[in-house]
């Protein structure tokens, strides 16, 4: 093991030890901010945005690109063979909560800064996993002036220029309560209205099956949570469903919503949007991000299904790609790990990008 990787693992060991699970997002008391402030070669600019959302900007010189790494993680869950917050290093892997998603990238960047860089810009954020993105949205408001943004997520050290967007919402249906022996239950039951809508929505989602970008095909649509009703002999007066879909770059959201028939109708139904974020690239034009990939000399990835905050930068007019060590299939599960060889590769690639 070379000295650069040893230093990287030292930083990763520290980062994993801080419980930055989101929820509960207790960043202030986790030790993370104290650790970054204790590093003499850093001068972190910390912005407290409230509710556990912190932007931590590291900047020096005149960098062309800015790196973004989220330092919050999902909760550990059950099934770990070791302490999730104690980095377990084997001959091939570094195992620990956030090692793959995506504290490994942060450790790489801290290593390179410690070894000496003249020009760099790194934004650590802490609220990606909750689907808030307050950190990125607020940072964008400062009108950052960079040639592009490299958002860190586990991509096997390949450059991602294209991924799906995300849209969630709640459709609520209203009925007229009464005894279920009444024939009107067929029409007045809110659950009946909901199931009819679900049938329509599934068919509408399938109508997009022939649309594709690379290996990404159709509209990823999911009925996620249903609630409503009281008991079998009462006509349900209210029922709701939470659903989501993942559009391809260039797909029109309003057109999709119209196809799903999410309109609110007086005394019948109401629709409430949830978390909404664009695809990457936000305008559907891959040209700028592909040019950025060439400029950075990164190996390209196929388009991916998962969403990242790169799309928010893209929406704001900043070319953005997704890049980082680790495989997404190893994230969000017990015994999360990143391969040591990928950390070594990422160190070299990040070094080349900065220089």
Explain the meaning of each model-derived region.
Residues 38-43, 59-65, 113-121, 143-146, ...:
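Short glycine/proline-enriched coil/turn segments at helix->beta-strand junctions
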Residues 98, 102-168:
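Acidic/histidine-rich catalytic neighborhood of metal-dependent amide-processing enzymes
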Residues 90-92, 112-123, 145, 201-210, ...:
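Phosphate-handling active-site elements
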Residues 48, 154, 161, 167-355:
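Metal-dependent amide/peptide-bond hydrolase catalytic core
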Residues 66-121:
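Active-site metal-coordination/substrate-binding segment of hydrolases
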Residues 1-77, 238-244, 256-259, 340-342, ...:
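N-terminal helical capping/dimerization or prosegment-like subdomains
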Residues 68-70, 123-125, 150-153, 172-174, ...:
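Short beta-strand segments
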């Amino acid at each position: 093991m070379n000295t650069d990787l040893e230093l990287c693992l030292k930083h990763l060991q520290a980062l994993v030890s801080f419980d930055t699970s989101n929820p509960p997002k207790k960043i202030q008391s986790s030790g993370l901010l104290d650790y970054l402030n204790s590093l003499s070669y850093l001068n972190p600019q910390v912005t407290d945005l409230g509710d556990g959302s912190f932007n931590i900007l590291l900047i020096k010189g005149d960098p062309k690109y800015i790196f973004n790494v989220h330092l919050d993680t999902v909760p550990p869950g059950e099934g770990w063979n070791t302490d999730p917050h104690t980095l377990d290093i084997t001959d091939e892997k570094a195992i620990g909560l956030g090692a793959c998603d995506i504290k490994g990238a942060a450790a790489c960047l801290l290593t390179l800064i410690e070894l000496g860089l003249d020009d760099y810009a790194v934004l650590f954020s802490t609220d990606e996993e909750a689907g808030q993105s307050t950190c990125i949205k607020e940072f964008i408001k400062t009108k950052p002036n960079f040639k592009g943004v490299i958002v860190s997520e586990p991509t096997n050290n390949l450059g991602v220029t294209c991924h799906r967007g995300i849209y969630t919402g709640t459709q609520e249906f209203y009925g007229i309560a009464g005894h279920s022996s009444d024939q009107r239950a067929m029409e007045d039951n809110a659950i009946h209205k909901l199931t009819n809508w679900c049938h329509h929505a599934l068919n509408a989602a399938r109508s997009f099956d022939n649309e594709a970008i690379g290996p990404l095909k159709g509209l990823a649509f999911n009925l996620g949570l249903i609630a409503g009703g009281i008991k079998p002999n009462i006509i349900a007066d209210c029922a709701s469903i939470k659903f989501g879909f993942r559009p391809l770059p260039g797909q029109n959201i309003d057109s999709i919503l119209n196809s799903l028939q999410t309109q609110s109708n007086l005394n019948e139904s109401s629709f409430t949007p949830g978390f909404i974020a664009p695809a990457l690239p936000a305008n559907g034009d891959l040209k700028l991000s592909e040019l950025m990939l060439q400029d950075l000399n990164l190996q390209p990835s196929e388009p991916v299904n998962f969403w990242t905050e790169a799309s928010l930068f893209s929406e704001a007019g900043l070319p953005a790609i997704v890049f980082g060590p680790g495989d997404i299939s190893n994230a969000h599960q017990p015994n999360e790990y990143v391969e040591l060889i990928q950390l070594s590769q990422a160190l070299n690639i990040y070094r080349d990008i900065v220089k």
